[in-house]
């Protein structure tokens, strides 16, 4: 009988959702949906010292924003698999820890942090890989009582079998093996009885009937420890798939302190990126579709995603590629969506007031629409539209070169004259004025359009000229033409 597909994303509530975590969540979601399975969101909050009060809510908000809706979590009916928060499962873990203690597969360890550190330093000095020596592996009841009489609280360590090889098939990496002699007896419960991650995750994955564990390569070294625990309990081991590392643009392993790249989903949201683009981009970080197509909706990704097309080679986080991809989505979005992404940044930058009357809102809407084709993300609208909110023009070097050409004074003077004669000041009227200027001066093409654009915007490239001039307004354009003549 085939086991139902059940996967989980199990973040620790220590901060915002990192792009690496978002990719893991996405791969799990896509795999579950492609197979008609369940996507479980579990909160691994056993590391109480690192937990942040608002982190769980923010993690869930970021997943919802990306469109990764879960089937089971802390906000759903628990059913037979809940609760979905680790600290609400502590009594469950303690029962299983006691089982290992009773079966002599785990033991109490009384070594202090200072003793452990001294042991590690001595091993390093001898050129050995640091690992727990096993000092307290076989303490007698009298020895344990002596430690406890001194008030020393023990941790619980798992008794790792010696001289064995732990092997498993990874859906991404193929056959993987670890020698138990290099692992050392690892801690499964802290002094306060709260379990460590490697223990809690095994118990949870077993009891929640998780069929596939899909996660990042950084968890690969945890896998042999977890498999040893599965075997100690006599439980079926789930299938594993470890996606490749994500490297920064310099091909270095990403650090959360790396300022060369924006690393948290909430930051991309606040900058005005589209969630569809982030999902599309993250899917291609380590997974390759069949064919050359690069733009996929979430539904299309669900249809195409398979683990056998996930690469074990590191994925490069190409910020230019993400900007390009988001631009593709923005160009094809409806204008109201783009306005929602961009307008808050014009307000936050002080370019526009928070309260806009109907006329000013329509002007802002048209302004944003003017740059919809160019925008890579919402916040970029501030820089793109700078010329609409300044008294003086900042000329680029290219614009200065254009304005120095000999035909420019005649073109600009004639254009100013044609604008004065207009009854209206709409894009269609402005195009007529440009055409009349062409007829009067004999200039056409770049010799005609470039001086006008350079004079009114300070640039030699930009959106449709007639719309640009209309939105700048007659008085502003008149003043800029005079300044450039």
UniProtKB/Swiss-Prot annotation:
EC number: 6.1.1.17
InterPro entries listed in its UniProt record: aa-tRNA-synth_I_cd-bd, aa-tRNA-synth_I_codon-bd_sub2, aa-tRNA-synth_I_CS, aa_tRNA-synth_I_cd-bd_sf, Glu-tRNA-ligase_bac/mito, Glu/Gln-tRNA-synth, Glu/Gln-tRNA-synth_Ib_cat-dom, GluQ/Sye
Subcellular location per the Swiss-Prot or TrEMBL entry: Cytoplasm
Motif stretch ('HIGH' region): 11-21
Chief location bin: cytoplasm
Gene Ontology cellular-component terms listed: cytosol
Ligand binding (ATP): 256
Repressor is among the record's keywords: no
Protein's recorded name: Glutamate--tRNA ligase
Species this protein is from: Shouchella clausii (strain KSM-K16) (Alkalihalobacillus clausii)
Source species taxonomy: Bacteria, Bacillati, Bacillota, Bacilli, Bacillales
């Amino acid at each position: 009988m085939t086991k139902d597909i059940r996967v989980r994303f199990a973040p620790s509530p220590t901060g915002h959702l990192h792009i690496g975590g978002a990719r893991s969540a996405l791969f799990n979601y896509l795999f579950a949906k492609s197979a008609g399975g369940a996507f479980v969101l579990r909160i691994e909050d056993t590391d109480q010292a690192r937990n942040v009060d608002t982190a769980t809510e923010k993690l869930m908000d970021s997943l919802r924003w990306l469109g990764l809706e879960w089937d089971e979590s802390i906000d759903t009916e628990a059913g037979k698999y809940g609760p979905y928060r680790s600290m609400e499962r502590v009594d469950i873990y303690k029962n299983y820890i006691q089982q290992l203690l009773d079966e002599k597969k785990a033991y109490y360890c009384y070594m202090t942090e200072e003793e452990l550190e001294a042991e590690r330093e001595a091993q390093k000095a001898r050129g050995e890989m640091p690992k727990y020596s096993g000092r307290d592996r076989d303490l007698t009841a009298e020895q344990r009582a002596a430690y406890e009489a001194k008030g020393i609280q023990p941790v619980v360590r798992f008794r790792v079998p010696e001289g064995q090889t732990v092997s498993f098939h990874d859906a991404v990496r193929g056959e993987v093996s670890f020698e138990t002699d290099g692992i050392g007896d690892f801690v499964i419960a802290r002094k306060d009885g709260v379990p460590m991650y490697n223990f809690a995750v095994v118990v949870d994955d077993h009891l929640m009937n998780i069929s596939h564990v899909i996660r990042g390569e950084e968890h690969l070294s945890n896998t042999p420890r977890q498999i040893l625990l599965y075997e100690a309990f006599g439980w079926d081991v789930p299938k594993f798939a470890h996606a490749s590392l994500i490297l920064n643009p310099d091909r270095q392993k990403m650090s959360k302190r790396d300022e060369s790249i924006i690393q948290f989903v909430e930051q991309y949201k606040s900058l005005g990126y589209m969630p569809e683009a982030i999902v599309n981009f993250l899917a291609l970080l380590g997974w390759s579709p069949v064919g050359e197509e690069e733009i996929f909706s979430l539904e299309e990704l669900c249809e195409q995603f398979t683990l056998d097309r996930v690469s074990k080679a590191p994925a490069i986080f190409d910020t230019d590629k993400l900007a390009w991809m988001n631009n593709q989505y923005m160009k094809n979005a409806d204008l109201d969506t783009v306005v929602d992404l961009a307008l808050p940044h014009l307000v936050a930058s002080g370019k526009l007031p928070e309260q806009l009357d109907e006329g000013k809102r329509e002007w802002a809407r048209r302004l944003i629409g003017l740059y919809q084709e160019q925008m890579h993300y919402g916040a970029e609208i501030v820089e793109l539209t700078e010329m609409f909110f300044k008294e003086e023009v900042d000329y680029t070097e290219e614009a200065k070169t254009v304005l120095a050409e000999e035909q420019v004074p005649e073109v600009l003077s004639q254009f100013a004259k044609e604008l004065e004669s207009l009854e209206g000041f709409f894009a269609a009227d402005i195009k007529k004025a440009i055409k009349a200027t062409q007829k009067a001066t004999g200039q056409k093409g770049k010799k005609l359009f470039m001086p006008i654009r350079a004079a009114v915007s300070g640039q030699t490239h930009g959106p449709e000229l007639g719309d640009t001039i209309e939105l700048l307004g007659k008085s502003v354009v008149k003043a800029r033409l005079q300044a450039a003549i």
